[in-house]
């Protein structure tokens, strides 16, 4: 831990900075994998080590102008945690588990490369993709489906998007697209007092945070069963989905090529791999800012209350969560 504490301008300004590193040894994690014949999952053991690094900054200013006193405070911090060791017998390093070098909160997914267009296909009868256009393993894409970037050539060199085997050594075309843990946590405090009145305001927020949310509040007609589609509501803001000019007569040119969402389906919309994969395009912004508290108080002068045997009388009004900027889907 390294710190710096400064007082300046006649102690009106105070600056505190800290940088720290913390090592955690023997974290609980799934231990050595057991043979399949055992019929049980690996027991948790003290098999993982983690290193956390971060910093904190706090700046405070207080002064007075005549009988008016005021104060301003600001704090900012950030940190990350990384797995430095994980003892198990699985050389494959599953992305769903700890692995050395992993940063906690990693979100793995695919990088979107727009939508498939009718020009990506040889014709509209066979729906065969042209040479050089990446296909999707297990899926027959159509115009309006999400297209993904081929980040890694597979062993067959088929220019095909796949998930590999879900390990660090073979993640397919997945990569780290975000992090679910908050970064750049900040707070602001404002205060002032004058002739018995005292005002305090507290604000806080997170500068950066990613979230993957998949439900019918985020995606149009997102369903889990074909039989449920007629019961699915279409919420406000979800109508900007890809549309063809006239699919019934074979015109699959996009009416809105810059649509936010891919084409709709008459069956489960994860067909075509549109919503069944985590993608950078649809990560939600979970950063926020809120005015957490506003408190106004008044202290009655002692000369007014001493006649009734009171030493102090103070009244206040406090409001919680005055303003809030929420999750952006």
Language-model features: where?
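Transmembrane beta-strands of outer-membrane beta-barrel pores
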Residues: 19-25, 61-63, 76-82, 194-196, ...
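Conserved small/polar residues in nucleotide/adenosyl-binding loops
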Residues: 325-329
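Outer membrane beta-barrel strand-and-loop segments of large Gram-negative receptors
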Residues: 16-65, 99, 103-111, 116, ...
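Extracytoplasmic gating/loop element in the C-terminal half of outer-membrane beta-barrel translocons
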Residues: 206-314
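Membrane-embedded beta-barrel scaffold of Gram-negative outer-membrane proteins
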Residues: 1-37, 70, 77, 81
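Short loop/turn motifs that connect adjacent beta-strands in outer-membrane beta-barrel proteins
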Residues: 9-12, 64-70, 83-87, 302-315
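Transmembrane beta-strands of outer-membrane beta-barrel proteins
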Residues: 13-15, 70-72, 188, 194, ...
């Amino acid at each position: 831990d390294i710190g710096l504490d400064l007082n300046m301008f006649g102690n009106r300004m105070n600056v505190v900075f800290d940088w720290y590193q913390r090592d955690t040894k023997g974290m609980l994690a799934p231990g050595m994998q057991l043979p399949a014949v055992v019929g049980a999952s690996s027991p948790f053991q003290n098999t993982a080590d983690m290193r956390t690094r971060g910093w904190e900054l706090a700046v405070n200013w207080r002064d007075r102008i005549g009988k008016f006193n005021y104060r301003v405070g600001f704090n900012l911090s950030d940190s990350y945690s990384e797995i430095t060791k994980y003892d198990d017998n699985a050389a494959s390093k599953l992305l769903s588990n700890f692995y050395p070098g992993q940063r906690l909160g990693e979100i793995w997914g695919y990088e979107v490369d727009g939508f498939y267009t009718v020009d990506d296909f040889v014709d509209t009868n066979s729906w065969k993709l042209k040479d050089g256009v990446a296909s999707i393993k297990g899926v027959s894409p159509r115009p309006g489906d999400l297209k993904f970037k081929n980040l890694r050539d597979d062993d067959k060199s088929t220019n095909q998007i796949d998930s590999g085997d879900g390990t660090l050594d073979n993640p397919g075309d997945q990569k780290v697209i975000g992090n679910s843990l908050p970064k750049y946590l900040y707070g602001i405090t404002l205060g002032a007092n004058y002739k018995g009145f005292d005002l305090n305001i507290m604000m806080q927020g997170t500068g950066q945070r990613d979230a993957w949310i998949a439900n019918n509040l985020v995606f149009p007609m997102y369903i889990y069963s074909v039989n449920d589609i007629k019961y699915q509501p279409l919420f406000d803001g979800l109508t900007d989905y890809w549309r063809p000019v006239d699919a019934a007569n074979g015109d699959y040119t996009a009416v809105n090529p810059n649509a936010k969402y891919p084409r709709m389906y008459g069956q489960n919309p994860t067909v075509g791999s549109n919503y069944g994969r985590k993608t950078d395009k649809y990560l939600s912004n979970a950063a926020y800012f809120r005015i957490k508290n506003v408190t106004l108080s008044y202290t009655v002068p002692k000369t007014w209350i001493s006649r009734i045997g009171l030493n102090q009388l103070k009244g206040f009004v406090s409001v919680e969560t005055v303003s809030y900027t929420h999750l952006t889907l």
